């Protein structure tokens, strides 16, 4: 099997619904680490989530305690981000899963693949930075990241 730029572009399209407005950012499949929570807090930079957006990160109990100890948990709460321990997105159902959410965004390829079948919602997939920006603006980028852009015929890199 050869994975080329066309395959990467197709995979990105498969993991991204044809809608950019989101309702939920879902981080933590598998559980988010303390480093990821700290990165989210840093990327938020004092901003808050868009009024329409639910932002939920799932973590292990030890990460929840560490985030509470170092102040990250408070920074996330002030930004409108909920941190929930001891659950995984692949097992969350309503009412813990926000019933009004119709489109979610995640940085997890695993959850981007399974979410439609598990929760019946449309999905957007992106980096942690993309997820944070979508939480603030209410919309995901409409174009793929550079790694998922198709190369025009004749411009392919060669292995030499």
Residues covered by each model-derived region:
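A glycine- and small/hydrophobic-rich beta-loop-beta segment
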Residues: 1-58
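Short amphipathic alpha-helical segments
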Residues: 38-39, 69-70, 117-118
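Predominant activation on well-ordered alpha-helical scaffold segments within soluble catalytic domains
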Residues: 38-41, 73, 77, 129-133
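Structural signal for hydrophobic packing residues in well-ordered secondary-structure cores
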Residues: 12, 16-19, 44, 48, ...
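Extended, charge-rich low-complexity interaction segments
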Residues: 77-131
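Extended hydrophobic packing segments that form well-structured cores
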Residues: 112-160
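Flexible, glycine/charged-enriched surface loops at secondary-structure junctions
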Residues: 19, 49-55, 86, 143-150
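Extended C-terminal subregions enriched in glycine
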Residues: 30-33, 48-97
């Amino acid at each position: 099997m050869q994975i080329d730029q066309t395959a990467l572009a197709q995979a990105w399209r498969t993991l991204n619904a044809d809608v950019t407005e989101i309702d939920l950012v879902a981080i933590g499949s598998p559980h988010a680490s303390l480093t990821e929570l700290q990165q989210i807090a840093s990327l938020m930079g004092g901003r808050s989530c868009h009024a329409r957006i639910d932002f939920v990160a799932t973590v292990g109990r030890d990460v929840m305690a560490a985030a509470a100890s170092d102040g990250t948990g408070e920074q996330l709460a002030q930004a409108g981000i909920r941190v929930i321990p001891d659950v995984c997105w692949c097992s969350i159902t309503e009412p813990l899963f926000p019933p009004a959410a119709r489109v979610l965004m995640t940085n997890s390829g695993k959850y981007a693949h399974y979410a439609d079948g598990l929760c019946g919602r449309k999905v957007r997939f992106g980096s942690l930075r993309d997820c944070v920006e979508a939480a603030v603006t209410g919309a995901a980028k409409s174009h793929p990241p550079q790694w998922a852009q198709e190369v025009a015929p004749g411009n392919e890199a060669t292995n030499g």
